Amino acid sequence: MSHPALTQLRALRYFKEIPVLDPQLLDWLLLEDSMTKRFEQQGKTVSVTMIREGFVEQNEIPEELPLLPKESRYWLREILLCADGEPWLAGRTVVPVSTLSGPELALQKLGKTPLGRYLFTSSTLTRDFIEIGRDAGLWGRRSRLRLSGKPLLLTELFLPASPLY
């Protein structure tokens, strides 16, 4: 099962450098903290609508593969992050199977818990980069994060109802 927002997320084209944009827009796109927390700061109840979750092979992650270690399997999680039930963000997380060891096994068991609630409580979280992307008038971003030095890739598409717009 897929969702149109995830199709658009996969169509994002990324800027080679951070573009010159309105400061308020950049504030959202370059946020280093949890997007879940940012949405909650808008006075909203944040929830996750699960689109897809499970192991995939390399052929199902062509956009992410150049940014991750080459492995036989990856954990894929695709969601809509909703604010008071309205989708504000589409998210796609790709986790190499080698990352899923020790405490990071919890990444497979998030269920309807927003990823940010897990990631941003970890003292071992680091971010390699944020890339800004755009497709058909919508903005997105992609980050390679590390937990205890182990990589995962998070791509987010801000949907039309999001306060980013």
Swiss-Prot record:
Coiled coil: none annotated. NCBIfam families: PRK11655.1 (NF008656). Monomer. InterPro entries: Chorismate--pyruvate_lyase, Chorismate_lyase_/UTRA_dom_sf. PANTHER family: CHORISMATE PYRUVATE-LYASE (PTHR38683:SF1). Removes the pyruvyl group from chorismate, with concomitant aromatization of the ring, to provide 4-hydroxybenzoate (4HB) for the ubiquinone pathway. Belongs to the UbiC family. The keyword Heme does not apply. It is found in: Cytoplasm. Gene3D superfamilies: Chorismate lyase-like. It catalyses: chorismate = 4-hydroxybenzoate + pyruvate. One of its GO terms (biological process) is ubiquinone biosynthetic process. It comes from the Bacteria. Its EC number is 4.1.3.40. It comes from Escherichia coli O7:K1 (strain IAI39 / ExPEC). GO terms for molecular function: chorismate lyase activity. Keywords: Cytoplasm, Lyase, Pyruvate, Ubiquinone biosynthesis. This is Chorismate pyruvate-lyase. Substrate binds at M35, R77, L115, E156.
